[in-house]
Amino acid sequence: MESTQVIDWDAEEEEETELSSGSLGYSVEPIGQLRLFSGTHGPERDFPLYLGKNVVGRSPDCSVALPFPSISKQHAVIEISAWNKAPILQDCGSLNGTQIVKPPRVLPPGVSHRLRDQELILFADFPCQYHRLDVPPPLVPRSLLTIEKTPRIRIESQNSRVLLAADSEEEGDFPSGRCVANGQRNTASPSATVVPESDEEVSSPAPSVPGPSSPFGLGSDTDEEQGQQPGVEESSLADSSGAAGEAEQPEANGTTAGIQAQPTEHKLKDTKVKKEAGRAGVSDGSVLERSPTLGEDSDTEVDEDHKPGFADSETDVEEERIPVTPPVAPVKKNQVLLAVGIGDPEAPGVAHLQDCLAGSGTDVEDKTALDVPLERNHTPMVINSDTDEEEEEEEEVSAALTLAHLKERGIGLWSRDPGAEEVKSQPQVLVEQSQSASGRDSDTDVEEESSGRKREIIPDSPMDVDEALTVTQPESQPPRRPNDADEYMDMSSPGSHLVVNQASFAVVGKTRAQVEEEVPGPSVILGEKHQVPLEGAQPPEEAWETAVQEGSSSPEAAASVRPSQQPVAEDAGTECATAVSEQESTLEVRSQSGSPAAPVEQVVIHTDTSGDPTLPQREGAQTPTGREREAHVGRTKSAKECCDAEPEDLCLPATQCFVEGESQHPEAVQSLENEPTQLFPCTLPQEPGPSHLSLQTPGADTLDVPWEVLATQPFCLREQSETSELHEAHGSQPSLPREPPGHQHLVHTSPVHTELLRIEGREIQTVEKAMGIPKEMADRMTPEREPLEREIRGRTENSERDVIGEELIQGTKDREPKKVLARDSQRKEADKDLEGNRESLEVEIEMSKDSQKRERKVEKPEPKREWEPADLEVTPDRGVTEEGSHDQKGQIASLTLKPGVGVKDLEGLASAPIITGSQADGGKGDPLSPGRQQRGRLSCQTTPAGKASRGDPEPPDHCLFSSVPEASTQSLLTSQSQKQSTPQPLFSTSSSEIPLPESLHTKPNVRPRRSSRMTPSPHSSAALKPNTTCPTNQPAASRPTSRPTRGRANRSSTRTPELIVPVDPELQPSTSTEQPVIPKLTSQVTEGRVQMPEPLLTGPEIQSPTSTEQSVTPDRKPRATRGRPSKSPNKTPEPLISTGPELQPPTSIEQPVIPKPTSRVTRGRPRKSSVRTPESVVSTGPELQPLTSIEQPVIPEPRATRGRPSKSSIKTPESVVPTGPELQPLTSAKQPVTPNLTSRASRGRSSKSIRTPEPVVQTGPEFHPSTSTEQPDTREPSSQARTRRSAVKTPEASVPTTPELQPFTSKKQPAPKPTALVTQGRTYKPSTEDCESVGPVAPDFEPSTSTDHLVTPKVTDQSLTLQSSPLSASPVSSTPDLKPPVPIAQPVTPEPIPQANHQRKRRAAGKQGSRTVPLGHKSYSALSEPEPQSSASQSSGASEADSPRQKRPRRQASQKTVVIKEEPVETEVKEEPQETAIPTPEKRKRDHAEEVTQGKPTRSRRTKPNQETAPKVLFTGVMDSRGERAVLALGGSLASSVNEASHLVTDRIRRTVKFLCALGKGIPILSLNWLYQSRKAGCFLPPDDYLVTDPEQEKNFSFSLRDSLCRARERRLLEDYEIHVTPGVQPPPPQMGEIISCCGGTFLPSMPHSYKLHRVIITCTEDLPRCAIPSRLGLPLLSPEFLLTGVLKQEATPEAFVLSNLEMSST
């Protein structure tokens, strides 16, 4: 990269000398600072950098003294020749080397590297970030600024200097990672005017060239990032710039920056300056202002430095609000503005801003080939702009709230997003900010889309025009109807829409979600109104599409369209906006990536949606596009109908689609940011994150995630994540989804992005627009959806599985398509991108996503999360899609009804929360997306029937939406869900989800959205809960946690969403009549798993009756449960699920409850809770959620564990998948699910996400409470199919287990269940086969299965979110409870039982591992019960035992009984006695058989029974991936510290801090053989036989480990001791303090000044002079060996370790 290069010192010396001489006088003040990120070494620190040479090294006399062993005495030198010159970094021949993080590069000694602002540097293993301080010297700065040469020379350093470069810079920052630095720097930058920007820009290499720098910079940045095509970027940039300039400001970047700056000047001086400096500069500026906050995020997301920067920037902008616009406006934004101005004279400000934002994003995208830079830049800008204007216009209050949210959440988002993927982050941020701006922004975007579609964004730029043309093609569809146009636009416009909208929309979407939470109605309304008029000016479809296609305008157009729809449904609008925002963000990012091509691609995506790709990629997407277009048209029509019935709905779906995209986008974006070239792929991943994330995940809160997210969850992110991978998988899958345009939306979306799907279904938005997309998709796809779905189904099924191989490759494409699916646009863009550089990017993104998802939380986590989320996401997507497809066919009638409004609205609602989740998790959103996708598909299908069935759905949806912000919304949603049950399938879940989200969302959204990614995640979780469940799971898996949380959350999100989708819809349809009951159930289930079920027609059928029946039971319980979510919830959830239907009206209640719990849980421990809750929620839906709440705390742990388990989680999903598919097949209705499953299976990872949903689906359908649950289960498995093992297995295990397990698990669920899940995930691989077995069983069992499924979903969820798992189980339990009501299942029981057994085994296995005993028990119990049926028993027994217990005992009894029962089955021996009561023999046999079949059954049940909770294993002194996998496969989790660990694994006795702490606490210290043997046995074996043996060390220290452990358990060694450790002691005082605390002593941080018995000072000879006071007081001065040796021997003998007077005197 240009960053690191040998410098021609001769040529530069003169210049530098000159500069330095001029600036030497300023050496007094630091020119920059080097930030050392916090870590095990200590807190974060900033070192000032002055003119001249700043030596970095271990020596105390170094300017930057890093006193760490791995740092050489003189490690490196940072030379600053002049204040405005880029510092030169040189390695001084250090031992461990100096590395540039972005792009990764080791700096050879003697080679100079120009440091860019915010650039990340790795000194040995210590990550640092260079920040340029904006302290422009009076003279030098200007001269330097004047000197083009310098800027050029310091391409990276001085990018900011060049105004044009600024644009590039932003892009550059993205790739370079300057973003982080920029964020911080930018703050200063504002004051510095151009120079600071210059600096910031400087940080971006691209901007080095002043004039061309903008385009060049973009290219350059891109280059830096991924070596994208600068030419393209330039042309794209130029185009965008030109267009923007023409419309807004003739001048390109500079002018644009200026103009934009003017509006935002007051708020965003930085932005302005930055803008002036360049787009990147502007973004940076925005970021900078928020830099401190963002900076941290940035720091956190060091990996995604630039991206974080962007994210930061976005956040900043959003926070600043005004800055938002300006930053967005700078280059692309300006262009966008231009487009807006042209397109939207009516609402010039908002439209303009939005356009700027969206357009800018698009423009930037168009303008710059560098997707990443632009994306990043763009996204933030979009958010800001949109948010800014719209918020201002909409409501200052809203704005304030949004801002607060944004800040809260933005920051969280930032951290996650940037971490997950900077690009993603940015989109997420955008979304988040947008959401923050809330509905406004999103509204604006949406409105703009509405208007924007009318907006004639065509003028934007040639590219834009091109896009417009492309759009026009889709426009042929627009004729369908304005609304249709909107919807279509959504689909059609998705490409450009995605492109622009993604960036813009990401903002909008997030904002919308946020606003929705904050002020759902108003924001949306305002934005919508505002924008609608703008957009309205032009023909809705045409203008809109044109705008969308235009690229710059495109996003806005897309947003516009959506808003247009949104106007109809304000809440939906908000949601829509959010979706749009997200999508826009994604698109924008993508567009940016695509640059000219990208815009076209975006357009293509739109076109794809339209059915007419502009670009080859588009063409690639085109095929799907045609179909998609059809689907879109169908959808659009459906949407239109809905729209007619309820424009809001339509809007929502469309918007939501976008949101999903956004979610995806953020993650993707972030991912892209990480990899400029791979911008698009990243963007796709971003969908999740979650998702991502985290929607972006990650998440957005997963925001995760994740970025991915958290992801996004990315994005997700982090989660997506989780989302990214899903996206990717989906992306691969896209081939599957891609095939049918309509489908593509759904399917693709799902593949692309579970989130996307959701997006399409609005799932993304909601939770993942859980409903939105379905609605839109359903609407549009409904007509052709069936065919498409069939096609897709077949295709998806085959495709999904086949695609798995292809997936990565196609994944990139597919992912894009998925995104597009989410937003056709997005998909298109993805396709285009994909084709452009998607594949590599996709792969990278997938990895990135994985990473990002985890990363969303932290870059590291992000990757895991990213791919996991992606996987999850993809899986859900695919699974959902497939399932949805199949199911949809069946349910199309039902679903369709709802899609229009219900889905959309719900989705919108869900979406908002989801977005949050998505953002947080990146993955979160995504997860929902998949569900939503399914839902969307379902929705479409259901729509007709649903519509017919529920004529109300739309209105309810609206109401729902309106209420969304509030619990009432949830209620409405629920109601709606019920009403629009069919549609709601998508929606129902959504509903559930949405209510959750709404309530959660609303509540938490505001708070969590920004507040914390995690929180949002939880909210998302809550909101997503069903969704989030997935997201959570996903996050757990990856999404995000999208970012971790993000990734995990994302993933969970994805998964959950899927679950949710099916459940809700199915239940909902069923519930139509019983709606209240079923919906709730559905909600729950939906949330949990009904989603999937929804696809299962059976589900609904059964569901109605069952639902009612069960519903009632659960209803009560759920409430009770709700009251005491934890235990009760377990039980309750069971009832709850049943109740779901009943509750569904209650769903709203339940949902509220869930949201509450979720909220609570989520809020309380947003991330974990989120994850867990969502899972719980998913299964139980509302009930579960409460449960989750309660359990969530536990779950969170797993969650944490999940951070790593994430993978496990993912795996689990895989296992699940088989089950899913089989289960799915079992459920005829579920069969669609099966495809999903398959898809998922193919997806593998995606599976995770999907997985939960899958189980849910199955269960859902089966039960619909039961079926629903089952279907979800199936679906989940489906989803999980991707993550086949876990999913399948989990579902199976889950299914059987769940019923009983759930109750049982409920209580213990947190620990055990998740473990089981994880284990299942892993274990499930074998399970797959079982799953299949189970599959058949499930159908037989249908109700039973449903329960099983439910369980599975739960398990799956759990798998995804280990922690969540328990909750999941709970829901499952619920199902069982329901099941008793539905003895139907009992007959089936036998088959299901095996299934259950399998699942149980798996689950148990999984759980045993983590939760070990409890889970096992639960799992087994549940399984067992279900198995022998225990079905009957369960039903009966559960009924009897559970009946009474059902409410609570059920859980308890169930747990116990279940545990016992199940355990016997699985454990056969252990639980046999207990299980005997319940058809133990039969069950056991079955179980056994299944277990045998699965091969892992053993492990699950037994261990769990043995251990109440899954072991939390900590490793010390060994890095053993095999052992870690064994832990996760067995359902255990990986502890991050001794405090949470239940077992320590090492290879020998060593006096490490962890070892001594564990010994002090009496924790078993085991050898690796324990894990290996446990893995073989399928459960965690008793630890006593596997204690570490090290005779040599025991001899050396004269102690026996076994004896010491016994003594430590009997009594803590230092119980009465108060100990102070002086600073010079080794290990250092903090670690000694940890040992002291673990041994029961009290650590005194400061020197004591009084005497007390057993108060001692641990010191060393060097510190003896410090000990004069204690020495006078007579306090014993002991050597460190008192502690080190004393703990080993478990003997406290101070007198033996007193430092002698001799030593003291000598000292």
UniProtKB/Swiss-Prot annotation:
Q: Which residues carry this modification: N6-acetyllysine?
A: K769, K1496
Q: Which InterPro entries match?
A: BRCT_dom, BRCT_dom_sf, DDR_Transcriptional_Reg, FHA_dom, SMAD_FHA_dom_sf
Span list, region Interaction with CHEK2: 1-150
Q: Where is the composition biased (Polar residues)?
A: 183-192, 252-263, 425-439, 580-595, 1026-1056, 1068-1086, 1101-1113, 1225-1241, 1265-1281, 1295-1308, 1317-1326, 1343-1363
Residue ranges under compositional bias (Acidic residues)? 9-18, 386-397
Q: Where is this region: Interaction with the MRN complex?
A: 2-222
Q: Which SMART domains match?
A: BRCT, FHA
Q: What is its main location?
A: nucleus
Give the UniProt keywords, A-Z.
Acetylation, Cell cycle, Chromosome, Coiled coil, DNA damage, DNA repair, Isopeptide bond, Nucleus, Phosphoprotein, Repeat, Ubl conjugation
Position(s), cross-link Glycyl lysine isopeptide (Lys-Gly) (interchain with G-Cter in SUMO1):
K1461
- Claim: Nuclease is one of the keywords in the record: no
Q: Name one GO cellular component term.
A: site of double-strand break
Modification comment: Phosphorylated upon exposure to ionizing radiation (IR), ultraviolet radiation (UV), and hydroxyurea (HU). Phosphorylation in response to IR requires ATM, NBN, and possibly CHEK2. Also phosphorylated during the G2/M phase of the cell cycle and during activation of the mitotic spindle checkpoint. Phosphorylation at Thr-4 by ATM stabilizes and enhances homodimerization via the FHA domain. Phosphorylated at Ser-168 and Ser-198 by CK2 in response to DNA damage during mitosis, promoting interaction with TOPBP1. Sumoylation at Lys-1461 by PIAS4 following DNA damage promotes ubiquitin-mediated degradation.
Q: Which residues fall in a compositionally biased region of kind Pro residues? A: 1378-1393
Q: Which residues form the BRCT domain?
A: 1510-1588, 1609-1700
SUPFAM superfamilies in UniProt: BRCT domain, SMAD/FHA domain
Where Phosphoserine occurs, the residues are 168, 176, 198, 220, 298, 313, 360, 385, 398, 415, 425, 438, 442, 461, 492-493, 591, 593, 595, 735, 750, 885, 929, 962, 991, 1104, 1126, 1128, 1327, 1359, 1435-1436, 1439, 1443
Domain FHA per the UniProt entry, residue ranges: 54-105
What does the entry give for GO biological process?
DNA repair; DNA replication checkpoint signaling; protein localization to site of double-strand break
- Return one GO MF term: histone reader activity
Renumbered to this chain, the Basic and acidic residues biased-composition regions fall at 264-278, 369-378, 626-642, 719-730, 778-804, 812-868, 875-889, 1459-1473, 1481-1493
State its role: Histone reader protein required for checkpoint-mediated cell cycle arrest in response to DNA damage within both the S phase and G2/M phases of the cell cycle. Specifically recognizes and binds histone H2AX phosphorylated at 'Ser-139', a marker of DNA damage, serving as a scaffold for the recruitment of DNA repair and signal transduction proteins to discrete foci of DNA damage sites. Also required for downstream events subsequent to the recruitment of these proteins. These include phosphorylation and activation of the ATM, CHEK1 and CHEK2 kinases, and stabilization of TP53/p53 and apoptosis.
Report the PANTHER family cross-referenced here: MEDIATOR OF DNA DAMAGE CHECKPOINT PROTEIN 1, PAX TRANSCRIPTION ACTIVATION DOMAIN INTERACTING PROTEIN
- Notes concerning its domains: Tandemly repeated BRCT domains are characteristic of proteins involved in DNA damage signaling. In MDC1, these repeats are required for localization to chromatin which flanks sites of DNA damage marked by 'Ser-139' phosphorylation of H2AX.
How is the subunit organization of this protein annotated in UniProt?
Homodimer. Interacts with H2AX, which requires phosphorylation of H2AX on 'Ser-139'. Interacts with the MRN complex, composed of MRE11, RAD50, and NBN. Interacts with CHEK2, which requires ATM-mediated phosphorylation of 'Thr-68' within the FHA domain of CHEK2. Interacts constitutively with the BRCA1-BARD1 complex, SMC1A and TP53BP1. Interacts with ATM and FANCD2, and these interactions are reduced upon DNA damage. Also interacts with the PRKDC complex, composed of XRCC6/KU70, XRCC5/KU80 and PRKDC/XRCC7.
Q: Identify this protein by name.
A: Mediator of DNA damage checkpoint protein 1
Organism per entry = Mus musculus (Mouse)
Its organism's taxonomic lineage begins at: Eukaryota, Metazoa, Chordata, Craniata, Vertebrata
- UniProt lists the gene as Mdc1
